Swiss-Prot record:
Membrane topology summary: Multi-pass membrane protein
Cytoplasmic topological domain: 33-48, 98-101, 159-164, 218-224, 284-285, 363-395, 452-471
InterPro entries listed in its UniProt record: EmrB-like, MFS, MFS_dom, MFS_trans_sf, Multi-R_MdtD
Subcellular location: Cell inner membrane
Entry-linked PANTHER family: BLR6921 PROTEIN, MAJOR FACILITATOR SUPERFAMILY MULTIDRUG TRANSPORTER MFSC
Name under which the protein is recorded: Putative multidrug resistance protein MdtD
Residues spanning the membrane: 12-32, 49-69, 77-97, 102-124, 138-158, 165-185, 197-217, 225-245, 263-283, 286-306, 342-362, 396-416, 431-451
Family recorded in the similarity comment: Belongs to the major facilitator superfamily. TCR/Tet family.
Gene Ontology molecular function terms on file: transmembrane transporter activity
This protein's record includes keyword Transmembrane: yes
Gene for this chain: mdtD
Keywords: Cell inner membrane, Cell membrane, Membrane, Transmembrane, Transmembrane helix, Transport
GO cellular component, one term: plasma membrane
Pfam family, one: MFS_1
Natural source organism: Escherichia coli (strain SE11)
Amino acid sequence: MTDLPDSTRWQLWIVAFGFFMQSLDTTIVNTALPSMAQSLGESPLHMHMVIVSYVLTVAVMLPASGWLADKVGVRNIFFTAIVLFTLGSLFCALSGTLNELLLARALQGVGGAMMVPVGRLTVMKIVPREQYMAAMTFVTLPGQVGPLLGPALGGLLVEYASWHWIFLINIPVGIIGAIATLMLMPNYTMQTRRFDLSGFLLLAVGMAVLTLALDGSKGTGLSPLTIDGLVAVGVVALVLYLLHARNNNRALFSLKLFRTRTFSLGLAGSFAGRIGSGMLPFMTPVFLQIGLGFSPFHAGLMMIPMVLGSMGMKRIVVQVVNRFGYRRVLVATTLGLSLVTLLFMTTALLGWYYVLPFVLFLQGMVNSTRFSSMNTLTLKDLPDNLASSGNSLLSMIMQLSMSIGVTIAGLLLGLFGSQHVSIDSGTTQTVFMYTWLSMALIIALPAFIFARVPNDTHQNVAISRRKRSAQ
């Protein structure tokens, strides 16, 4: 990329900057949840909603981000994304109640939903096609560093300052990014088709109310009748979307996608698989602090081996899948992740703390292999004219399943524990033990889906898409 103009390189730095902000925020909050609960006078069992409100908002807003960028311009939308993310961070730091914090996190989520996909779109428009892969590697590298720094930085700020600083550090960074975006980034626009607003609203309502209903009376205090009403509204909204999308060429996500068997299996497996794995980044630091008495900084440091294992495994995933095939790899990694989850719980409760970094490193390796395999399986056989829509739907499902996973983890803690789990409680470790056992079972269940995947070992990761028209 050395032959790119200076202006283009600066624009790539701005996109990389946004990727770093968004990825850092996905992990920096987890370590601070117990301290937030104490400061806000809430039970730790309710704090999972701090994560859910952000991730669910990202899932809801993702389908609109690309259309908005084409319609209004990538610079305008990227600038708006940074401003909303920064304002959300400020309001998070100023929050005095859990409800205020949840609203501020939702505002952050609107910005986060637009930042990454619009950043990818910007790279496509400013660099030559032959340099696109190198440019994407450059801008996504900070996004890989964010999860590595997030847990430890969050723990450090909580332990030596306060939880408010995990949000306040975004403000000067966001101001610099917003100014640089206005000054340096071109405002590319494209002719767009009419946005499927009806489909967008139906999906948004369905996802939001079903997730809220899943949280149930344990997390929200809603009555059983209200929860039943939410479930009914959510199901009706999703059914109406299916009717809306049938034979509709302008639907947000075409139902023709599901005629490709590997896409259907991969999407179902990704949804179920990420529900289980989405629990782990939330539960691990909470368990280390509340269940075992680790300090926030120590708990954050313990998360680093998991990220390192994930980053290291990415280099050889292609060779592994090509050697053994999708079915064997996905079934093995799904069951393996369940076993590693049990191993982590066992070694932690036995007090073998020196073993935990190695277990978490192994967990990161297994999870990374499974994620990469699920992603490529889902998209590899889609025809060209459906590839973009399929990728957008996969991105939305990834975020939605993570929010559901965190919600279920909070629900399990509430089911097995009292309203106020604390380090001093004699039943705390028992509560966490039952929760981890339930999580291990949930993590293993998608193996039944992956067992149905054709085990073609010759065309696994080479996504040289054949030119086909959608049927």
